[in-house]
Amino acid sequence: MTESPQKRHLGQGIERQNEQYACQGALSTIGMRIRQSVDRGYQVSGAAPAPAARTAASCVQDNSELTIPDYKRVPMPSSKQAPMLVNSRTVSSSSSLEMWENQLDERLEHIDNDIMRNKRAFEQVEDW
């Protein structure tokens, strides 16, 4: 009873098949070799490149000089007025917090009046 438990293999293992092609063994490990190359940063065996060259080679190509032209800001003539930051289309003046509060007070008062009219006194209840 003091024996340590051991795992037993219940199934049958897959037998190694004969290679149909000479490179079949190399193809079976290509996924792992690709992952290792990516992990190493595509460094080829031999002398390691300089850090600056390694960084430049691993960066994505920068096309910002071609796609983003250099715009030069020209000052506005003094005869023209700067555009308004706020105008009638960006701000609505038809409503304000004060108007909303007044309407809220009126609505609450109307609700209170309706509730007071709908209440019945104890004597008016005929269900008893």
From Swiss-Prot:
InterPro entries: RNR_inhibitor. This is Damage-regulated import facilitator 1. Transmembrane segments: none annotated. Its main location: cytoplasm. GO terms for cellular component: cytoplasm; nucleus. Belongs to the DIF1/spd1 family. Pfam families: RNR_inhib. Residues 70-97 are annotated as: Disordered. Keywords: Cytoplasm, Nucleus. It is found in: Cytoplasm; Nucleus. The keyword Nucleus applies. Mediates the nuclear localization of the ribonucleotide reductase.
